[in-house]
Curated annotation (Swiss-Prot):
Residues 194-278 form the 5'-3' exonuclease domain. Pfam families: 5_3_exonuc, 5_3_exonuc_N. CDD domains: H3TH_53EXO, PIN_53EXO. 5'-3' exonuclease acting preferentially on double-stranded DNA. One of its GO terms (biological process) is DNA replication, Okazaki fragment processing. Disulfide bonds: none annotated. PANTHER family: 5'-3' EXONUCLEASE FAMILY PROTEIN, FLAP ENDONUCLEASE XNI. Its EC number is 3.1.11.-. This is 5'-3' exonuclease. SUPFAM superfamilies: 5' to 3' exonuclease, C-terminal subdomain (SSF47807), PIN domain-like (SSF88723). Keywords: DNA-binding, Exonuclease, Hydrolase, Nuclease.
Amino acid sequence: MRSPLVLLDGASMWFRSFFGVPSSITAPDGRPVNAVRGFIDSMAVVITQQRPNRLAVCLDLDWRPQFRVDLIPSYKAHRVAEPEPNGQPDVEEVPDELTPQVDMIMELLDAFGIAMAGAPGFEADDVLGTLATRERRDPVIVVSGDRDLLQVVADDPVPVRVLYLGRGLAKATLFGPAEVAERYGLPAHRAGAAYAELALLRGDPSDGLPGVPGVGEKTAATLLARHGSLDQIMAAADDRKTTMAKGLRTKLLAASAYIKAADRVVRVATDAPVTLSTPTDRLPLVAADPERTAELATRFGVESSIARLQKALDTLPG
């Protein structure tokens, strides 16, 4: 089997590192570096386990894209710290001690020569979805703690799997179409697309998506298993001769405007204009700029984490 392309959900991983690694871990100058250490250590573990020859850290260049807000104004509204005028991305509410650590992580990635991928006006989910969907050569492993990305699982044209970090990296679960179908009771032949439709119907308070009132995850899964797709569910709800319960029909038809708008909000983009920070996504076996990498590691107090990353890279074939 070919070595995989590993796509890391940057924000998901450094948020989890920030909250999962003690804040007592600091740089020599006293600045917290718990997220930096946790992120680099997690990346080393993923490289050791998955043995990729290509890797990209995917970024939110716009964590709350305007096209999604235009469709569902409540989308992530509760996480806005400071609205920005003139179409600029709103400022996200982020712990004060995390923001400077994100800059440190990106400095280290740049010095090491590890690719960072982003697309103006799009979230990291869209970057991950675009890169996974357009891959035609290597199997893809998406690493994230965001369940929304289960919609990208696929078997063709290349296997796309999601390493879900919901309970942490040590207890991560690998999902493909079969696992998504089994876990959520969805049609196996379109498990990824069906998961997006499940999320749309169920809603997601953490993203400000209301869902269809009175339709929870179990009901949504039952509807998808019975009818096959969201379009077919709505066709059945619109059919007076349907066997669908009257109360459920009423709920779905009352929410038809939301369902239509939310479809584009919930589904990740697969055509985002993604660019890389490096010429290719080839995973470097040694730091591109060893002097700068060493200087940053010393300044941030993460020499041991960089050593663990290098040890993981040393196990890969040249």
